[in-house]
Amino acid sequence: MKDQGLIIGIEYDKSVIQACVYDMRAGIPVACDEVSGLSIADAIRRILGRYNVDEIGSLCVKSGLSDIEELNDISDQINSLGINENQYMITGPIQSFAYYAYSQQKELYKSGVVLMDYDGQIINIYRLSYNTADGVQYIVSAHEQYTIDSQSGMSDKKLVEYVSDYFSRNTASSVYLTGKGFDVKKLPDGLSKVLVNGRKAYIGQNLYVRGACYAAYENIYHDIFDNVTLLVDGCIKVN
């Protein structure tokens, strides 16, 4: 099964944002260059050509789109390359993040894992956790949203206060930050201290695409989610 074609994850919003290929030797997704702005079909062709490979083993496209016509367009682009339905998935942001988070070491999610997606005005927080019912394991999500007045000049202070309040009410083994509202080089004063108080903290703008790549891998090998049901917001299509 190790030689059945490339395992690819793509982040898409009307055009390709970024893409990853799963490195079987390293056991991690590896970023693909020069695919931003392409269609899904063109990005896949470029990736296959770069790796000198003819076949897709598994593909996952993370989409923020919910319109059925746009989702059908994604499927049409994939189908135009001769990729079978059982070879690809289309996932939403939180679904992709779940694949990323639960592909990490257990110590990073055993007490819950939190995603903070901040666009500079609205912060969406999702907490994922295991739950068991009737002998079946589930991953469930809880969502909060908070609007920060960016015109007041107090946005950083309000952000730190809200995050501090959130973690006074919620436990987590780790927290992941993403979105254009977070500066990966410098977080607001006081925020780092709040984030790492009793948990691990990570920041990056590639969480969703890496999660999509892990999802594509999982679609073949079932290492993590074989006996787990994923019940999170934004589940779009899993073949």
Predicted stretch roles:
Residues I83-S96, D189-C213:
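Conserved phosphate-binding/catalytic loops in two-lobed NTP-binding clefts
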Residues I74-N79, S111-L115, K193-L195:
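ATP/nucleotide-binding catalytic cores
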Residues G57-Q104, Q205:
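Active-site neighborhood for divalent-cation/phosphate handling
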Residues M1-V30, Y102-A142:
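Gly/Thr-rich phosphate-binding beta-strand-loop-beta motif of the actin/hexokinase/Hsp70
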